[in-house]
UniProtKB/Swiss-Prot annotation:
Belongs to the XseA family. This is Exodeoxyribonuclease 7 large subunit. The gene is xseA. Its EC number is 3.1.11.6. Heterooligomer composed of large and small subunits.
Length: 466
């Protein structure tokens, strides 16, 4: 606040003025024409914004330029979001620009925001409507231009990671007046064909006008109504379209979309080999157990051959005894012979042998039945083990796919190149020492500014401390 009784210095007066402006005039949108545009080596842009009667100085600093999709020029009409401020070093009133758009681009943005709001209110973006990817993907439909680099990138990634998958290209132009009709028709054909397990709709980066077909309501509703899971891979990561919001999954790039729908074949082969080894070991252990069990059961079952041998030996003994004594027995007592004959008949070895054979056959039948039961039990256990293995393979596949997705996202967001791509830079001296303060910099010193796609070499003309 101003104190009418205080005598101010110029710097303190301008400081109070600046604070008064910043605290009382909010951020606002202005429309005007660019003039007197200058672009010094610092990377900041300075120009005047004018209408038919007045003009005002504006500053667009480098860190606010990262999302600008056009090159400002003198004479073009723009829509700017500004913060009023006072440049105290010279006492000049100026507007610091936070956002700038061409007038035509501004209309597209308004249309985008309105459609986004309407579809969001209808629930088209709600997660409850998002379809999950199938566990097994054999055929991938791709909606893109057959002559663009996007389809080649997708094919390359799929061939490297999982060459067994089938790719169906539904060719369509991806920008221009007829693109929305072509894209929608291609999507409907791919979805209604029933041949695709998942559909990728993709194109490379471009301006808002280039990507506008993907912001049309007709395409958004076609994606929402599709029965097949849809993955959008449109533009760069910083580009967000209506199609991205309504799709089941949004991939930052077409190549990443191809990675999402495939598993690494080497990893799958390795996991399959491990599971096969585990299954083989389990099978051998189970087989060994039941073989031991079978041997134990065999020992418990008496051998009928021993009984037969015993009876045969007894028969031989009786025959010999009968031969040596038959004369004396015959002469001694015919009645006793008849009695013995009757006794022998009652204890006929043939009858005993038949009975022993009958017991032997019953034992064999029982043994066959038990062996058959053991085999059936083993087959059931093998079937259950195979089924359990399939579930384990499926679970491991899903687990590694989720882990790969998380790791890929983490790697992408932690990449230093990604930071540079968002408009940040790294400044160092000619000895590659990173400069984080103006205290270590001298006038006429050469500094190097590292950007995403190259480096800038600058000479220091002036140093201002905050």
């Amino acid at each position: 606040m101003f104190n009418i009784d205080e005598v101010y210095t110029i710097s303190s007066f301008l400081s109070v003025c600046n604070k008064t402006i910043e605290n009382n005039i909010p951020t606002c949108w202005l429309q005007g024409e660019i003039s007197n545009l200058t672009r010094p080596a610092s990377g900041h842009w300075y120009f005047s914004l004018k209408d038919n009667t007045v003009q005002v100085r504006c500053a667009l600093f480098r860190f606010n330029q990262r999302y600008i999709k056009f090159s400002p020029k003198n004479g073009i009409e723009v829509l700017v979001r500004v913060v009023p401020t006072l440049y105290e070093a010279r006492g000049n009133f100026q507007l610091v620009i936070q956002q700038i758009e061409q007038i035509g681009i501004g209309n597209l943005n308004l249309a985008f925001k309105q459609l986004k709001k309407d579809l969001d209110n209808e629930g088209l973006f709600d997660n409850i409507h998002k379809k999950p990817l199938p566990n097994t993907i054999n055929t991938i439909g791709v909606i893109s231009s057959s002559t663009g680099a996007v389809i080649q990138d997708i094919i390359k990634v799929l061939n490297n990671r999982y060459p067994f998958v089938k790719i169906l290209l539904f060719d369509s132009i991806v920008q221009g007046q007829d693109s929305i009709k072509k894209l929608t028709n291609a999507l409907n054909i791919a979805d209604q064909s029933g041949k695709c397990d998942v559909i990728i709709i993709a194109r490379g980066g471009g301006s808002l006008e280039d990507l506008w077909a993907f912001n049309e309501e007709i395409l958004a509703r076609a994606i929402f109504n599709a029965k097949t899971p849809i993955i959008s891979a449109i533009g760069h990561e910083t580009d967000t379209t209506i199609a991205d919001l309504v799709s089941d999954i949004r991939a930052p790039t077409p190549s990443f979309a191809a990675m999402l729908v495939t598993s690494n074949r080497l990893e799958l082969l390795s996991n399959t080999n491990k599971l096969y080894t585990q299954l083989h070991q389990s099978y051998r252990q189970t087989l060994h157990y039941y073989q031991s069990r079978l041997n134990q059961l065999k020992l418990k079952i008496s051998n009928p051959n021993k009984q037969i041998d015993y009876l045969n030996q007894k028969l031989d003994y009786l025959s010999i005894n009968l031969t040596t004594r038959k004369e004396s027995i015959f002469t001694l007592n015919n009645a006793k012979l008849n009695s013995l004959f009757t006794t022998l008949k009652q204890h006929s070895p043939i009858k005993t042998i038949k009975h022993a054979k009958s017991l032997n056959q019953m034992s064999l039948n029982q043994l066959k039945y038990q062996i058959k039961q053991i085999i059936n039990t083993n087959n059931n256990m093998l079937y259950l083990a195979t089924e359990r293995l399939q579930k384990i393979i499926m679970a491991l596949t899903n687990k590694h796919k989720a882990r790969l997705s998380i790791q890929a996202n983490s790697l992408h967001y932690l990449s230093p190149l990604n930071i540079l791509a968002r408009g940040f830079s790294i400044t160092s001296d000619t000895k590659n020492q990173v400069l984080s303060s103006v205290t270590n910099i001298k006038i006429n010193q050469t500094i190097i500014t590292q950007l995403d796609n190259g480096a800038l070499y600058s000479n220091i003309e002036k140093i201002e401390k905050n």
